[in-house]
């Protein structure tokens, strides 16, 4: 390739990159993130020592107690990340290798064998309510990239810990820990309450 050809290819790739960024910014403006109200959640009446005395579901009848990663057992968080998304702190919201693996296994076995969703993609599905379809997965990918562009990894992990479904009307690790184990998530050990029940 000549110098003029290289120069032309660089110009085209730069233009394509600029158009891609402009399109992504336009999509971000047109389809804002459906972030939950930070004040939403169940009302919990606490004793002086922090023990819940009485809890009330939110307006939708969902039991959800707000929590932060540091309020959850580090063993639980470690087990969650190991089981659900061991590359959470290294990928931009989407793990193309996990998606390729899941697609390859589905083709070979003619059924869904493993998922390719990252923790961020799961948060996107929880917040956006995307359907289980090819279009839904594409939308999940776009929302995951959007989440990663707007929020820190800690904020994404917090959304997951607050919003992950644990059966029925129980959402979030803190509400599930109280409902199933009768103790706060900070005292929940990984072996007693595994991410697999998600």
Q: What positions do the PLM features span?
A:
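Juxtamembrane regions of bacterial inner-membrane/periplasmic proteins
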Residues: 1-198
């Amino acid at each position: 390739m000549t110098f003029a050809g290289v120069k032309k290819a660089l110009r085209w790739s730069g233009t394509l990159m600029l158009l891609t960024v402009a399109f992504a910014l336009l999509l971000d403006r047109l389809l804002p993130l459906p972030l939950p109200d930070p004040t939403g959640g169940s009302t919990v009446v606490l004793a002086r020592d922090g023990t819940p005395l009485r809890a009330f579901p939110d307006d939708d009848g969902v039991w959800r107690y707000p929590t932060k990663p540091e309020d959850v057992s580090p063993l639980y968080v470690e087990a969650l990340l190991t089981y659900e998304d061991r590359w959470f702190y290294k990928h931009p919201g989407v793990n193309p290798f996990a998606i390729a693996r899941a697609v390859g296994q589905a083709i070979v076995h003619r059924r869904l064998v493993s998922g390719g969703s990252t923790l961020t993609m799961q948060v996107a599905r929880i917040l956006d309510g995307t359907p289980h379809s090819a279009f839904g997965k594409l939308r999940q990918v776009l929302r995951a990239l959007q989440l990663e562009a707007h929020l820190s990894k800690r904020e994404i992990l917090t959304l997951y810990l607050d919003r992950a479904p644990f059966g029925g009307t129980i959402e979030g690790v803190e509400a599930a820990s109280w409902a199933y184990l009768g103790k706060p998530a900070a005292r929940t050990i990984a072996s007693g309450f595994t991410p697999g029940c998600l």
